[in-house]
């Protein structure tokens, strides 16, 4: 397999026209000048007793005598690229282990016992063979992409940028030697390197790096012990852990959470097809055997008999949740929900069907219990993906509000600021944005003029000048990105600023198992700059009004431990997801791991008055189970039944900090949801409740502070004044 220098060869129509087409989101179209075309002809077959037929296929490249190799390991080599690329080889005594529509896998009947080289290779051929056939294979060695064989006649193959290649034999002549037993399948998890994908790209280390370990098994028969499913089937793949997995601690649904600085290399993708229905916590009651392949920028296991898998899958019993946070008269409930490209357009592919509208509306009523304020992420304009210059999304938002009401929920009001056409990223023509639903019987959107699409939000005298308003919409850091939307609400006399966010996506990051190693988060720097803008906005609001309350909601497109989220938090906020129970700390599922793209941040002046929880109704499930979006909603509730203590302005020291433990009773984030508190930095369980300590210097008291000393001084002055008047009157 080729790791860095990616050559391209175009398969002929003989091998095309079948299978699901895959085109990467990051692709470079290959021009005719860049493509080396090889006509892959049907392999000719001989019987070992009949000799070579007169019609045996040859090519211009077969001028010199083919190299007879001892085993497939010589073809694969101890690297990601075959040392024999472009050479014609002859391989004897190889066994067919699996067939597909464009070829088959063969493996050495007798291993070379070198764990650093694969014993198997893919043969691109239309020849009819069966599993267990013993063959002699003669053909040309190629490094290519499995996606090539999904290209239909008349289509142009586009190289998947950043993808590895697969070692193949093309232009093959096949000689059948008989039948034999299949090689024993290796337990793929037994020697899988933990955490590290590839830290030394110039060296080949299958013993310590997962990328190289997978390469050393390319095409080989492997086995997974009674796999446990970690998440829903997506694009024909499921991700599993072996039933005897003994690695990191599992989360509450038997999966693994993403962790800082490492990858969950032990999670294994298995190809099952788009019709396969599975969710987190399901499991197989038998071992699964398959061959190792590579497609869509990841290694995966292609089962020997995919049709048998449905009969082996057992229901793990996971059901969609209902929030443990219920409405209360003196408590403000705020939910945030990425509703995945929602619009009023229900006509056409990739638009919003009525069934989805019902599912999302019902989730707000039945599973999230009709929150007072809802921040909506991924609202599209009124006609969705129709690229006609429409930017207004009021019909989209009001359609959801009306559906909630018709199904028995509150009569929500909708507010947004439409973006400039084509300026906020997302699906072309859809003009994605963040927006709000709010219950006017519970909260008031402070009545001020609404900000413009390119007008930056400002604080004047400690409150938003315009409401709602977009935060720094002209910043270069928010180009082609959804602009954060600030809105100031009043609840029972309390003012609170809610900020809905949808930061730069991760599209453009290197694939974890791609050709660029170590993989780089190319989008990270932009999110950090966006985070700095948000943190500065919070600081200014608190500078003007230290008692102003803030809630920042999803989607940050980053994790609770990420630099970008930590930058937003700064010294002014608390990340409730980072404080949440470790086993429940997720809202999204991607390539085998549970993760927390959806965080809720609050200002420290309400940290002792809140409860928080993600509500797991989507990320672990498929549409067949009721899934309405790819994200779970997250909910925070603030208890305003007793006033919060006044807060003085604070600044974060540039060098060092002073940590003073405060009274534990005043420092707990309420967790009546049965969570186990963990250290936010290293996830080490500490106690049943988590103490939040102050790590900041406090400025001198100002006139805004209502400290007891000032109150006492004021009372003393008033008493002196009235006593003086009494004496004069007497």
Predicted regions and their residues:
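A cross-kingdom C-terminal cell-surface attachment/processing module
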Residues: 16, 669, 684-727
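Acidic beta-strand-to-loop metal/phosphate-binding motif
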Residues: 16-19, 139, 372-379
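Extended non-catalytic accessory segments flanking core domains
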Residues: 52-333, 337, 341-347, 351-370, ...
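Gram-negative bacterial Sec-dependent N-terminal signal peptides
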Residues: 1-27, 710-725
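Divalent cation-coordinating acidic motifs and surrounding scaffolds
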Residues: 54, 62, 303-646
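Low-complexity, acidic Ser/Thr/Pro-rich repeat tracts that form intrinsically disordered stalk/linker regions
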Residues: 22-73, 77, 85-86, 644-696
């Amino acid at each position: 397999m080729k790791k860095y220098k990616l050559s391209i060869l175009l398969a002929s129509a003989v091998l095309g026209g079948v299978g699901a087409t895959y085109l990467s989101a990051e692709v470079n179209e290959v021009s005719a000048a860049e493509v080396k075309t090889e006509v892959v002809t049907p392999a000719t077959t001989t019987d070992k007793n009949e000799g070579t037929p007169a019609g045996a296929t040859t090519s211009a490249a077969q001028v010199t005598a083919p190299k007879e190799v001892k085993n497939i390991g010589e073809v694969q080599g101890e690297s990601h690229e075959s040392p024999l690329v472009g050479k014609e080889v002859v391989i004897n005594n190889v066994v067919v282990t699996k067939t597909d529509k464009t070829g088959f896998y063969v493996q050495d009947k007798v291993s070379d016992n070198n764990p650093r080289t694969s014993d198997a290779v893919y043969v691109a051929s239309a020849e009819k063979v069966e599993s267990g056939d013993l063959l002699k294979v003669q053909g040309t060695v190629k490094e290519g992409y499995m996606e090539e064989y999904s290209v239909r006649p008349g289509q142009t193959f586009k190289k998947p940028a950043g993808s590895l290649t697969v070692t193949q034999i093309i232009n093959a002549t096949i000689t059948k030697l008989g039948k034999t037993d299949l090689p024993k399948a290796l337990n793929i998890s037994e020697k899988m390197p933990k955490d590290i994908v590839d830290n030394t790209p110039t060296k080949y280390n299958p013993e310590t790096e997962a990328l190289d370990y997978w390469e050393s098994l390319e095409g080989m028969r492997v086995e997974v012990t009674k796999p446990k499913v970690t998440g829903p089937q997506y694009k024909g793949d499921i991700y599993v852990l072996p039933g005897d997995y003994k690695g990191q601690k599992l989360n509450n649904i038997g999966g693994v959470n993403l962790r800082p600085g490492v990858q969950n290399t032990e999670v294994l993708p298995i190809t099952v097809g788009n019709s396969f229905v599975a969710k987190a916590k399901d499991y197989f009651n038998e071992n699964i055997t398959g061959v190792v392949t590579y497609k869509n920028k990841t290694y995966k296991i292609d089962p020997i008999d995919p049709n048998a898998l449905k009969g082996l899958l057992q229901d793990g019993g996971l059901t969609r949740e209902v929030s443990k946070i219920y409405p209360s008269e003196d408590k403000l409930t705020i939910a945030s929900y990425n509703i995945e490209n929602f619009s009023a357009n229900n006509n056409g592919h990739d638009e919003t069907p009525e069934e989805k509208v019902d599912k999302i509306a019902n989730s707000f009523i039945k599973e999230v219990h009709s929150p007072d304020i809802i921040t909506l992420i991924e609202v599209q304009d009124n006609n969705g993906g129709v690229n006609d210059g429409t930017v207004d999304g009021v019909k989209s938002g009001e359609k959801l509000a009306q559906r909630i009401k018709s199904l028995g929920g509150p009569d929500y009001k909708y507010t947004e600021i439409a973006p400039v056409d084509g300026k906020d990223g997302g699906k072309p023509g859809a003009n994605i944005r963040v927006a709000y639903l709010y219950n006017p019987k519970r909260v008031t959107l402070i009545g001020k003029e609404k900000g413009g699409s390119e007008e930056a939000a400002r604080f004047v005298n400690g409150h938003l000048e315009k409401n709602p308003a977009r935060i720094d919409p002209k910043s270069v850091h928010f180009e082609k990105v959804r602009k954060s939307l600030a809105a100031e609400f009043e609840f029972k006399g309390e003012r609170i600023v809610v900020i809905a966010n949808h930061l730069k996506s991760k599209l453009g990051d290197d694939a974890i198992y791609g050709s660029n190693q170590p993989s780089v988060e190319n989008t990270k720097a932009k999110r950090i700059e966006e985070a700095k803008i948000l943190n500065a906005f919070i600081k200014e609001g608190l500078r003007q009004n230290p008692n102003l309350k803030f809630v920042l909601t999803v989607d940050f497109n980053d994790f609770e431990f990420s630099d970008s989220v930590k930058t937003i938090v700064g010294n002014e906020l608390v990340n409730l997801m980072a404080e949440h129970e470790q086993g429940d700390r997720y809202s999204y599922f991607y390539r085998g791991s549970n993760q927390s793209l959806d965080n809720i941040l609050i200002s420290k002046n309400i940290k002792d008055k809140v409860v928080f929880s993600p509500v797991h109704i989507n990320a672990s499930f498929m549409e067949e189970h009721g899934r309405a979006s790819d994200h779970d909603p997250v909910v925070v509730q603030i208890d305003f039944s007793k006033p919060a203590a006044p807060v003085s302005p604070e600044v974060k020291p540039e060098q060092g900090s002073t940590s003073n433990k405060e009274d534990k009773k005043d420092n707990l984030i309420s967790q009546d949801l049965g969570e186990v508190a963990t250290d936010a930095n290293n996830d080490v369980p500490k106690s049943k409740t988590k103490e939040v300590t102050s790590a900041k210097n406090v400025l001198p008291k100002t006139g805004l502070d209502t400290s007891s000393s000032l109150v006492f001084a004021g009372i003393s002055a008033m008493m002196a004044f009235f006593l003086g008047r009494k004496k004069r009157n007497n």
